[in-house]
Amino acid sequence: MTAPFAIRRLNAADPDFGRHLDHLLSWESVSDDSVNQRVLDIIAAVRSRGDAAVVEFTQRFDGLQAASMADLILPRERLELALTRITVAQREALEVAAERVRSYHEKQKQGSWRYTEADGTVLGQQVTPLDRAGLYVPGGKASYPSSVLMNAIPAKVAGVSEVVMVVPTPRGEINEIVLAAACIAGVDRVFTIGGAQAVAALAYGTESVPRVDKIVGPGNIYVATAKRHVFGQVGIDMIAGPSEILVVCDGQTDPDWIAMDLFSQAEHDEDAQSILVSPDAAFLDRVADSIARLLPTMERAEIIRTSLEGRGALIQVADQAQACAVANRIAPEHLELSVADPESWLPEIRHAGAIFMGRYTAEALGDYCAGPNHVLPTSGTARFSSPLGVYDFQKRSSIINCSAEGASVLGRTASVLARGESLTAHARSAEYRILDEKEA
């Protein structure tokens, strides 16, 4: 017999609300010492033995019999074949989603700029793409073609010359729709490897796997730990925590809609977090009833139940101002403003990965096909970080081109500051370029 469902209820008027909220939001990665050491050993092996180590780990962890790295490379023709092996509806959905993602990210492209000062000195900024990006994609039946689109398309829009995808194929299991997504997104090379060994291969390069400049994409605790260790050798997107959603509702949305929106994140895994905030206590009761009634109808009911009971909450607030204060404190990955006039709320929202405005804007639309990226900051990091975008695959270089007059004027200032820091060579380097009065 299934136990009665119970989700945490909080009230922002409670004197201990802050402490209870902190407890609700607390989450620590489970990367313990044993995981950390295993990852370090794998990275060291890949650095020293290259392809041989990658093949060995792939055989051991993925149950895949490969004689050499040649068996772990998928040519472009294989990606094109995948397009013919998925349904017409799947291909059309991928193409629609890809076009919307591409169109949105085209608007994020940053351009170079410069300006000229009165003395002829030119200052500016040059924007250039990364040479090569690595994309990690989880493998097996539970893999996510939408993640391929969201990670690869911004890189190609940015002008990255080569996108290298790694995707494990446990026991040889290949997900055709993931390969089809890679084809549509413009992925250049695919290796059927995964885990920490794939991250290490991308970061340091092997005889077959080219070294990349940045690694993006989700993965398990071994992948996340490996990304943390190779950061600095390469760039990474983020160390993502569990998925999360915060719904703020005025009490006028269908409670079944809200319940299903909460489920949409809770079904990811047991650590996912789904929270509803509303000033209407009776509405919170109705949503709780909807959750209890709809939960048994869900395919992933036990995962949803564990997530909601362990990390979910229904929070009552006094008004819009308090709701926004709670939202900013949580800084959620996904924020739904399921209210009558979401535009009036927007100026008060400072911290959120993505903001879904109005009753009709389900978070699931953003996950797949709205256009904005679904790779978002989690665990409160929206306080200081942003969604993945084109700018993550571009670099900026400062441009300084001094005229003789400009170098002379700046040289005097630089000399004073350099000598104040006792850096004589700096000072003299600037002073050599100072014009004497008859030259000026």
Swiss-Prot record:
EC numbers: 1.1.1.23
Keyword Oxidoreductase listed: yes
Family of this protein: Belongs to the histidinol dehydrogenase family.
Residues that bind NAD(+): 136, 197, 220
Any Pfam family matching the protein: Histidinol_dh
Annotated substrate binding sites: 243, 265, 268, 334, 367, 421, 426
Coiled coil: none
Names of required cofactors: Zn(2+)
GO cellular component: cytoplasm; cytosol
Swiss-Prot/TrEMBL keywords: Amino-acid biosynthesis, Histidine biosynthesis, Metal-binding, NAD, Oxidoreductase, Zinc
Pathway(s) per entry: Amino-acid biosynthesis; L-histidine biosynthesis; L-histidine from 5-phospho-alpha-D-ribose 1-diphosphate: step 9/9
Cofactor descriptive note: Binds 1 zinc ion per subunit.
Active site, renumbered: 333 (proton acceptor), 334 (proton acceptor)
Uppermost EC category: oxidoreductase
A single BP term in Gene Ontology: L-histidine biosynthetic process
Job of this protein: Catalyzes the sequential NAD-dependent oxidations of L-histidinol to L-histidinaldehyde and then to L-histidine.
Residues holding Zn(2+): 265, 268, 367, 426
Species of origin: Pseudomonas aeruginosa (strain ATCC 15692 / DSM 22644 / CIP 104116 / JCM 14847 / LMG 12228 / 1C / PRS 101 / PAO1)
GO MF assignments: histidinol dehydrogenase activity; NAD binding; zinc ion binding
Name under which the protein is recorded: Histidinol dehydrogenase
